[in-house]
Amino acid sequence: MLKEVQEVKVGGRTRRVHVRPFAWGLKNPSHMEWTPDGRLLVSEHTAGTVRDITKGGDASEAKPLVYNLQGPAAIRPTEDGKVLVAETWGGAITDIAGGGDATKLPKLSENLKGPYTLAVLNTGKKGETLFVSESSSSFMTQITRLSLGNHEREPKAFILDIPARHGEPGLTPPESWPDKWEKYAAAGCVKNWIDDAAGRGFFYLAVGSLGQIFRINPDELPEKITYSELVAHPNALVAWGLHRLGGMRFHPSSGLLFAVQPEMGEVIAVDPAQPGNYHFQPPVVRGLRMPTCVRFSQDSEKMYVCSSADGVVWEVEGFLT
């Protein structure tokens, strides 16, 4: 049960965390992102829409910003004004900056395998590089990269053979029931999530099914690497022993990484500077119904958490020590 005021013990101190509904009436909200012009967008994964929830409130009657998307997931703005969204069921990455009917909007990349989460790194002279999580099979995922500059955009596999597990039938398109739901759900919210660490030249990778978080610096790794090789790489693994992970976000001012544990209904804080086993780490927030994504207000004082099961984005205050 979700309590509006929760008492959380952190470092021997007890503090109060306030949890309130910020936006509601959403259909399976799965991912959020801020645009450079200050809009907070949310993907409605099974509804095929992206909505602007900047002002909060009842979103059920508001006209969607974009519609006719096929399983919209991660949203990621780029330096050149694009607003990219991963279409998981459509196998594409679409630029939704123009809004409206997604079938008429430009595709950055197609023929991908269940693209789900996105991260963008600026690699200097080569410009921005997009990293995408894909489903290589029902039980394996991979991280693929492609250039956003005036270079070859052919997707190239980067991290291979990352363990995963299938999701739930209710998070798949109706045409997949009952025979193909496992194929679609493999690219659902049990996939591996990535976060670009607020432009620090590396990204974090959550291997959700194993409760692990890695720090990925492409300059320190080979052009192509497997999950088993990554585990053995020094200083890559920053957290383990967690429950199944969903979305996460780096909090710049505190240096902490906040991640959701959907099946536990919790948000947990991880300190990447102190790698370790976080199995017994108390959550920052508990009692949520299937939380999938976390973002912060532009002043970093408030946390927003998607709750896909009840169609609500929650606003959390007091989560910082």
What are the roles of these predicted feature ranges?
Residues W24-R39, Y67-V83, E87, S109-T129, ...:
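Beta-rich, blade/repeat-based domains predominating
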Residues G48-R51, G91-T94, S138-I143, G211-F214, ...:
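Structural signal for beta-propeller blades
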Residues P29, I53-G56, P72, I96-G99, ...:
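Tandem-repeat architecture and repeat-register "anchor" residues
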Residues I53-D58, I96-D101, S147-E152, N217-P222, ...:
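Short loop/turn segments that connect beta-strands within beta-propeller blades
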Residues L2-G25:
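A short helix->beta-strand "capping" segment at the edge of beta-propeller domains
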Residues H45, T88-W89, S135-S138, G208-S209, ...:
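Short loop/turn segments immediately following the C-termini of beta-strands
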Residues H18-A23, S60-V66, T103-S109, E154-D161, ...:
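A short beta-strand motif characteristic of beta-propeller blades
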Residues V42-G57:
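Beta-propeller domains
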